[in-house]
Amino acid sequence: LDVVPAVQANWTSDPFTAEIRNDRIYGRGAIDDKGPAVAVLYALRAIKAAGIPLRKNVRFLLGCNEENGSTDLAYYLAHAAMPPQVFTPDGSYPIIHLEKGMLRLEFTKQTADPIVRFSAGTAPNAVPADASVSLSAAFCGTAEQGSQITCLGNKLAYKGVAAHASTPESGDNAITGLLTYLGSDAAFADCKALAQLFPHGCTDGSGLGIACADTESGALTCICSMLHVENGMLTGCVDI
């Protein structure tokens, strides 16, 4: 339920086995969105106990693929009718009456950049905290290395800060950080091009020329959330 994919190597315990340490529960999705789900059950129980008559039926739906495209919802709609009214109890107060539209894009390209393997991101709707790359040639970039970059032989890694795609400004995108660094070497033309489309620290889509904002919903958010290179094929994901 509302569980983002987990990279086992980034955990000191099994992410899918809840573990309590120092009065805190550790596990992937331990909070999201368990409290509100339980609150709905208690609310329905309270209505029933109080004998409050309902003019309409109430159906409680729990989906377990929300973080990866809600394919379970498609199955549900193929077997049951869409409810006339739906609300999701996962927001804050005051009541949220507006939600941004969402667009996810995937792109692929055969790259000539001297990259053996590039790996970053596990979920399309999250700012990745880690990015790593293995190179097939010596790196001759001019960018300042900075504390986020570590180098070990022909392997480079960037340590950023994870964040939800809806609030990317609170994170540090490891993909764009590493792309910016690699792009300072003329041999990494595709990395440089991507760094221009997704400037490090920019989250409003300015690099793509799509930045916009309004009073109610605020600024558009745009992140490169996943990027991988295998056998010369570059694949990426953009969350808008």
What are the functions of these language-model segments?
Residues 67, 74-75, 79-240:
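Midchain, well-structured core segments that form catalytic/ion-binding scaffolds
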Residues 29-44:
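Active-site alpha-helical elements of protease catalytic centers
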